[in-house]
Amino acid sequence: MMASLSCVEDKMKTSCLVNGGGTITTTTSQSTLLEEMKLLKDQSGTRKPVINSELWHACAGPLVCLPQVGSLVYYFSQGHSEQVAVSTRRSATTQVPNYPNLPSQLMCQVHNVTLHADKDSDEIYAQMSLQPVHSERDVFPVPDFGMLRGSKHPTEFFCKTLTASDTSTHGGFSVPRRAAEKLFPPLDYSAQPPTQELVVRDLHENTWTFRHIYRGQPKRHLLTTGWSLFVGSKRLRAGDSVLFIRDEKSQLMVGVRRANRQQTALPSSVLSADSMHIGVLAAAAHATANRTPFLIFYNPRACPAEFVIPLAKYRKAICGSQLSVGMRFGMMFETEDSGKRRYMGTIVGISDLDPLRWPGSKWRNLQVEWDEPGCNDKPTRVSPWDIETPESLFIFPSLTSGLKRQLHPSYFAGETEWGSLIKRPLIRVPDSANGIMPYASFPSMASEQLMKMMMRPHNNQNVPSFMSEMQQNIVMGNGGLLGDMKMQQPLMMNQKSEMVQPQNKLTVNPSASNTSGQEQNLSQSMSAPAKPENSTLSGCSSGRVQHGLEQSMEQASQVTTSTVCNEEKVNQLLQKPGASSPVQADQCLDITHQIYQPQSDPINGFSFLETDELTSQVSSFQSLAGSYKQPFILSSQDSSAVVLPDSTNSPLFHDVWDTQLNGLKFDQFSPLMQQDLYASQNICMSNSTTSNILDPPLSNTVLDDFCAIKDTDFQNHPSGCLVGNNNTSFAQDVQSQITSASFADSQAFSRQDFPDNSGGTGTSSSNVDFDDCSLRQNSKGSSWQKIATPRVRTYTKVQKTGSVGRSIDVTSFKDYEELKSAIECMFGLEGLLTHPQSSGWKLVYVDYESDVLLVGDDPWEEFVGCVRCIRILSPTEVQQMSEEGMKLLNSAGINDLKTSVS
């Protein structure tokens, strides 16, 4: 290690050199930074061959991620000292002086990252050149000298811990069948026995030849000839691990990992532990004072934790969540087969690890306890950036989280700009070093208003205020939704057979039918005088309803009625100056004109789209735009009802959220096919004498006010099913969709099941496999329905944080009330689950598709048939997923988003 850098050190006039687990070189010469970097590159390129990045990362482990060259990081001297302590097996003593001018975390820019591997032991390590900076503005433009750009983990590999027979001189190496079939070339099983020669390379580009044979009773894959030579040359013993990978060039490579063994005696040439600790601190302090680059060596297998943290990761952990005692968290650990597994725990304390030397340091300032009893090898202190909090796991769901099968690219004949936009999440935590959003959300999707809505703690009364705020933005034209639509919204299709011309007005006969009577009431109510600010929105909303209902000629009466309502309302606004301002009337007239007059907008990239593709995308786009409006008032002689707009049935939300579209081809996205899929867009009215509000009570999970109706077939409900308390399934479907979207998916992290606190492994899978067999097409073919397939089981487990899980038989209860009462008695929560609105406690369950839903949302028979486990959430757990972690976005991210929207 030292010999390879001697020439560089002479030319750079090195003033400080420390060997061991943490080697640091501080440069004090007057040569420029570019010359030093060129020297480093020349020396590393001439002295050593280039290390294969994928094999290096496979040996390092799945959790290791090196920073990119040119990025900003935080360097923690405490973590570097821990690496020195592990290599010397001696911690720092009181003889190590304190450096008050050295901060606990030092902001640096990464100038170089070089991968290394020891020739004798194959121990891997990385050399990093760090430049201290005062702030993000001091970033130096780093040229590309072919240095490491980012971490490359292999996609195809397997890792096995060697047994005694694997390291014997006559046994050979047993390869798992799946690994052999996946990585090795196919065997000729017609030969007796099937054999082949494998040529693999290691980290040092050495070539090894193994004989791969399929034999034994039972038969298994073995590496025989050449394996003993490999074991002897690498000095492998039982407990060490061997990895086989295929890199991006499809080359077969092999690597080794040494098991941690106690070292009997340290070599006499190694410096004392105190000297090495002093060298780490002194070199870092000197580089900080003089703003000169310094070198560090990072050993991922020996180091307890990473001490070079990317700036974005640090800010996301420190500023993106408010950690508190009692908070639940998850943390990833490496498994024996080089996989990843999440362990769950609880924060029991927040304090400085070393208050004397490093007061206020974030390094391992969290005291934790693990759920599982066999976690003695897990650390009792962790850093905030090492854990995953509930808000980081669940609060940023992807817009496509409802899709259980991705649409095949061939359905779209090439991805368009709109297709790429709907695949992006609406909100993402900034990954850039300066905290700027990587891209702005699409303005016409009302991202600003959506962000504001999501920043607030949930309250059902926030929905009218949110709608009023959007209405004000629309009327005033402050870069609101309608203003953006004028500039960016693609217009309606040019298919006359599917268009309702404004000249085609239909006179509704009041005595024709009940449906016609309802349509007449709708027309009369929309023509009735209203408040000034609501008049404008009603006209615009009617235009959106007209577009949303324009699915086929079979619904021509409803569509034409809505068209008449829209035109009459616009005429009323133009004839009554007292009811609205000219600006309001002009906006409504423009929007109405946009619906009937197709135009082209090359800005959004729709000029070269096919007619059918444009039809589908425009229909979804305009329906989404109509989903952010205040509920308009429908009044009749005996009743008045506030009905939600057509957001509940907007085609875009079905296109994006609804799993029922996964098996459809692209040509089925036309309005005529949407009629078959979404027949629920028939808006019915109730003639009851009471005043009803179509605003079902929603849970206080995030995204309650921004969702689509899922698995709803309104054809099975009579007239009046959409109003007030007459539609219980409406609220249930909204509740189920919201809960599933809020809990099931995350853009930044993987999905996970709830941990098993009652014993067993308690594993939390990082990847959830979904069952696609639940989608069936009915005999008529007019709609898609999700059929709950009953699963054979005996008991259902009920889990609660901090308590031992219980098992119950849900079939022994008659309804939800009995179930909740029994669970309350089991866990001593009398009255908390039966009155969730006042207590704040939530009872959720996981179905056989791994969707997390609220208990009570679905019919009892369906719940009994699909429940897999039940989970009790305390008010703290519920609030953490909806409120915490948003303060940073509310203060910093929203400003950037406002600028991009306006």
UniProtKB/Swiss-Prot annotation:
Residues 497-543 are annotated as: Disordered. Residues 793-877 form the PB1 domain. Residues 158-260 bind DNA. GO terms for cellular component: nucleus. Keywords: Activator, Auxin signaling pathway, Developmental protein, DNA-binding, Nucleus, Transcription, Transcription regulation. GO terms for molecular function: DNA-binding transcription factor activity; identical protein binding; transcription cis-regulatory region binding. InterPro entries: ARF_dom, ARF_plant, AUX/IAA_dom, B3_DNA-bd, DNA-bd_pseudobarrel_sf, PB1-like. The keyword Transcription regulation applies. The keyword Transport does not apply. Transmembrane segments: none annotated. Pfam families: ARF_AD, AUX_IAA, B3. Expressed in the whole plant with a lower expression in leaves. Detected in embryo axis, provascular tissues, procambium and some differentiated vascular regions of mature organs. GO terms for biological process: auxin-activated signaling pathway; embryo development ending in seed dormancy; flower development; leaf vascular tissue pattern formation; longitudinal axis specification; meristem development; regulation of DNA-templated transcription; response to auxin. Its main location: nucleus. Disulfide bonds: none annotated. Changing Y439F: In strain; cv. Ag-0. It is found in: Nucleus. CDD domains: B3_DNA. Belongs to the ARF family. Auxin response factors (ARFs) are transcriptional factors that bind specifically to the DNA sequence 5'-TGTCTC-3' found in the auxin-responsive promoter elements (AuxREs). Seems to act as transcriptional activator. Formation of heterodimers with Aux/IAA proteins may alter their ability to modulate early auxin response genes expression. Mediates embryo axis formation and vascular tissues differentiation. Functionally redundant with ARF7. May be necessary to counteract AMP1 activity. Interactions between auxin response factors (ARFs) and Aux/IAA proteins occur through their C-terminal dimerization domains III and IV. Homodimers and heterodimers. Interacts with BRX and the auxin-responsive proteins IAA1, IAA12 (BODENLOS), IAA17 and ARF7. Absence of the protein probably causes early embryonic lethality. Premature stop codons are associated with vascular defects. PANTHER family: AUXIN RESPONSE FACTOR 4-RELATED (PTHR31384), AUXIN RESPONSE FACTOR 5 (PTHR31384:SF10). This is Auxin response factor 5.
